[in-house]
Amino acid sequence: MTDTPQVLLAHHLKTLRLPTFLREYDKLARQCAAEGADHVRYLARLAELELIDRERRMVERRIRQARFPAVKSLDSFDFKAIPSLNKMLVLELARCEYIERRENVIALGNSGTGKTHIALGLGLAACQKGLSVGFITAAALVHELMEARDEKRLLRLQRQLAKYQLLIIDELGFVPLSKTGAELLFEVFSQRYERGSIMVTSNLPFDEWTEIFGSERLTGALLDRLTHHVHILEMNGESYRLNQSRKRQKSPKTPA
């Protein structure tokens, strides 16, 4: 039995990986017929729908691959709550040109001031620009590095980390590092120097980073590389999370 044209078309579109074509071609054909649009306009509109949907799927895939703990945008950040933060610089960074230049970003501030939110927002902006992003806490990264070293797959993990155009390392300084952990993390920073962008959030000022790495020599060498091409976001102030919690408590509740 010969397949109908509709069945053949569906097969061809699936083979060509054009799911939006397959889903929309019949409905759009009816619309174009009603509007008197010719076949060129019909195909152009169908191709545009496919491109829009493909870009959406690519962004979603990059977000999944980034392993964000949550998806947060800069639009939802209350910049007024952290007056020390340079909003114009953040918005400039959201254009992601610093990633093309392989520059770094460091967000410094006491706990709860929204550093992770800003990092997530800039990471999301990079995904939307078509860039590859990886997100991980410093403690988790060191754990993965040490585990990979013990299992003799450290080189493979280092190569995987090097593929990210932007590597976000969150919460540096929350947990002191062992000598081995500090050296492994230093290698990550060193390997990305002028090759790929790093974004770091930390609750400690630079002069206290020796407490993290345990060695003035190692800390000095790391800061020399990290701050050579860097944008620093100062985020000291009252807890951003506490302010947001207060606002939610004060907002009138919708009656049941």
Regions found by a protein language model. Give the residues of each.
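Intrinsically disordered, low-complexity and often Lys/Arg-enriched segments
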Residues: M1-H11, R248-A256
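Solvent-exposed alpha-helical segments within well-ordered globular domains of core cellular machineries
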Residues: V7, H11-K14, R23-D26, R41-R45, ...
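Interdomain "pre-motor" coupling segment immediately N-terminal to P-loop NTPase/helicase cores
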Residues: P19-A70
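Extended interfacial segments that mediate partner engagement and assembly in macromolecular machines
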Residues: R54-L108
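Conserved P-loop
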Residues: L85-K163, T210-F213
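Walker B motif beta-strand of ABC-family P-loop ATPases
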Residues: L166
